[in-house]
């Protein structure tokens, strides 16, 4: 309780500065799932996919009996597809703005106005998602109000600040505009797929969450061949002159998230920021307490 009272939240500007300057590290969010309701998993996936991070991937580790209905797997594909349009829009806007502002110090009013318009569009996208989400229980309320609309409210504040700078004819630094565009790109850009360890004879069959996670983590960074054997399909490292069937993602950071949990905005940013502070070089794991849903 005393630590909670004394805790001071890292200002947003410090996060922006830390993750600027071509920050290129990645994070992989692993969601172990065992016979979960598809809608429960979908909310978890969305809360992870909307995390703001330079290189983000969300992997659903399905541990149901082999060959399930795959409703959970469809949820992660659905999220990836829905994010594609805003991600493309904001990536294009970022790149065009960077080219237009090359070698300039202050952003033109038209550029600031366009950035405000893009922040309004991003907020509207999230608000529409919340407005059309079917509310069935208190976790749906939490998802819509805290995950979707919470992020939208944050983006609305930036839109308001940009519009006020135009009204007051205030200088807006070029680097700040580019930071703001980078934030939009990171929020709406995420890779996603699923993995089922029970499809392979070479991965652990122990019936617990830890081994579900470890089965995937142990393969990260490997180039693998899918091989049919008398015991079933196995995954093995490729041999010299072989072409891999799978090149498994690797990343500097891994975040594990229960399939019935949700992340609030900035969660990944703030955890990684703490791990990268001077004096924390030997820190390997960081854990945060979580709260139950109201209701």
Question: What residues fall within each predicted segment?
Answer:
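Alpha-helical membrane-embedded segments
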Residues: 1-4
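Internal catalytic domains of large membrane-associated glycosyltransferases
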Residues: 8-295
């Amino acid at each position: 309780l005393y630590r909670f009272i004394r805790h001071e939240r890292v200002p947003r500007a410090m996060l922006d500065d830390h993750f600027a300057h071509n920050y290129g590290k990645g994070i992989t969010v692993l969601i172990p799932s065992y016979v979960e309701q598809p809608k429960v998993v979908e909310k978890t996936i969305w809360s992870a996919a909307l995390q703001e991070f330079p290189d983000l991937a969300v992997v659903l580790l399905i541990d149901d009996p082999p060959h399930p209905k795959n409703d959970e797997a469809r949820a992660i594909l659905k999220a990836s597809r829905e994010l594609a349009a805003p991600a493309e829009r904001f990536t294009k806007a970022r790149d065009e703005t960077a080219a237009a502002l090359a070698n300039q110090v202050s952003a033109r009013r038209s550029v600031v106005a366009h950035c405000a318009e893009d922040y309004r569009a991003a907020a509207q996208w999230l608000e529409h998602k919340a407005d059309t989400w079917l509310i069935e229980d208190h976790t749906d309320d939490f998802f819509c109000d805290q995950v979707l609309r919470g992020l939208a409210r944050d983006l609305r504040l930036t839109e308001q600040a940009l519009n006020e700078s135009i009204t007051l004819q205030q200088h807006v630094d070029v680097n700040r505009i580019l930071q703001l565009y980078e934030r939009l790109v990171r929020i709406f850009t995420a890779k996603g797929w699923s993995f089922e360890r029970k499809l392979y004879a070479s991965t652990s069959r122990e019936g617990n969450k830890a081994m579900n996670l470890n089965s995937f983590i142990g393969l990260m960074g490997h180039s693998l061949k899918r091989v049919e054997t008398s015991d079933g399909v196995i995954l093995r490292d490729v041999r010299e002159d072989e072409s891999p069937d799978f090149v498994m993602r690797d990343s500097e950071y891994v975040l594990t998230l229960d399939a019935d949990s949700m992340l609030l905005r900035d969660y990944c940013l703030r955890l990684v920021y703490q791990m990268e502070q001077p004096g924390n070089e030997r820190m390997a794991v960081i854990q945060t307490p979580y709260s139950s849903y109201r209701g």
